[in-house]
Every structure is written in C-alpha cells, then in structure tokens.
Amino acid sequence: MDNPIMARAGVRGRYDVIVVGAGHNGLVAACYLARAGRRVLVLERRPLVGGACVTEEIFPGYKVSTAAYVASLFRKEIVRDLRLGEYGFEVLARNPSSFTPLPDGRSLTLGPDAEWTRREIAKFSARDAARYPEYEAMLERVAAFVEPTLAMTPPDLLRPGPRDLLRLLGLGRAFGRLGDRAPEAVELLAGPARAILDRWFESGELKATLATDAIIGAMASPSTPGTGYVLFHHVMGETGGRRG
C-alpha cells in the first residue's frame, strides 16, 4: 500500500531511497545511488533544484547566486563520474578573486594573474609580494597530499585488515614526501589561521583578505584552532585545472 502522505503529494510507487532536499549534495547522492541500481526519489519543496547552489533573479534584470559564494569545491571526480559537462555544467573562474576596500580609499584586488596580484600586494608590502608565490607553492604541496584522501574510505584503526594497513602505509609515505613542510601541514590541518598568516606576511591588509577564507561559514575567529584547515580547504577548489 502506498504511503498516504506520499499519495497526497502525488508521488506513488515504492523506492529504495528517499532523498529529502534537492540541493547539490542530495542530487549527487541520488545520482550515485541510482547508478548503483537503487530506485531513488528526490523531494524538494521549492520550485527549483540546487539548494544553496542556485542562481535567482532577486532584482529585475539581475541574476545572482543567492547563497553559494563559490562552486569550485565541487569535486572534479563527481563531474567526471556523472558526466556533468555533457549536460552543460561549467565552473567559471572568479576574476578578480577578491576585492578588499579600505577606509582610507585604498583597495587590494587579488586575481588569477600572478603579476597583477604581485603589484597589488606590493602596494602594501614588497616583502609580502615576494613571499606570496612561495606561500601558494606551500599550499599546493600540502594540497597534493591531502586532496586524494577526500574521496578515500578512512582506514579502520580498531580492527585493521590488509587493505587498511595498505592505506595507512600509503598515507605515511605521502606524508613523508612533504619533507620540511610536514610541520606546516600539521598546523594547516589543526592550527589557527592567524598563526600561519602572521608567520608568512606582515601586511594587515593582505592577512585580512586571506583570513576571510578561514572564517567564512565557520562562526570562529582566525585565532581559533582548526581555522587553518578552513583556509586551506578553499585552496583545494579547482576551476579549469587552476586551484582556488
């Protein structure tokens, strides 16, 4: 017998899985379940799907993202597995990537062009402008270690089997390849963003701009342990083969 609540909603039949909410996470889960042969029903109360990743016309003639500020953290493996590009999915790079207006009329604009970014940072600190490429290279090196683990099933540490031991061995080897960056990687994953930015840079304007990635959506200050990872996590986004 059909569920009376489902019947009132005009939905009939039997399903293996019901996903409540057609946000991007729910849609991805539903697609993978359907690929695995499950009969899936997705329920959404709004007239459009996408959850926080939607574009809406909130002023006549102007369409904006009404929630998500970036979409580059959407995993490339998902785009590939679900063949989203064949259906028109495309992530556009932000240009500029950030704009920081200051009370004295100055501003700091960062973007994908390395020389432009260097000149912008140099307005506040020549030292920071010189160090910024090294900072980005450090983040890239740590990201190369962390990123493959995002789609990995964590090893069972309580009752490890042969596969768990192989995963642990692989993680240990990958971590060892970080070399002298290993302590910095640990701090990025567990420490406060402020300590990291203070060590790399002297300009308050640049540090404030970069710190926004560490606190957005986190309800925490840059001095809170763990915000280093929030800062780092945003670096693992990717658009057209470019991180950020």
What does each of the following model-derived ranges do?
Residues L188, H233-G244:
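Helical element adjacent to the flavin cofactor pocket in flavoenzyme catalytic cores
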Residues E44, S97, I215, G228, ...:
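Ligand-binding pocket scaffold of soluble enzyme catalytic domains
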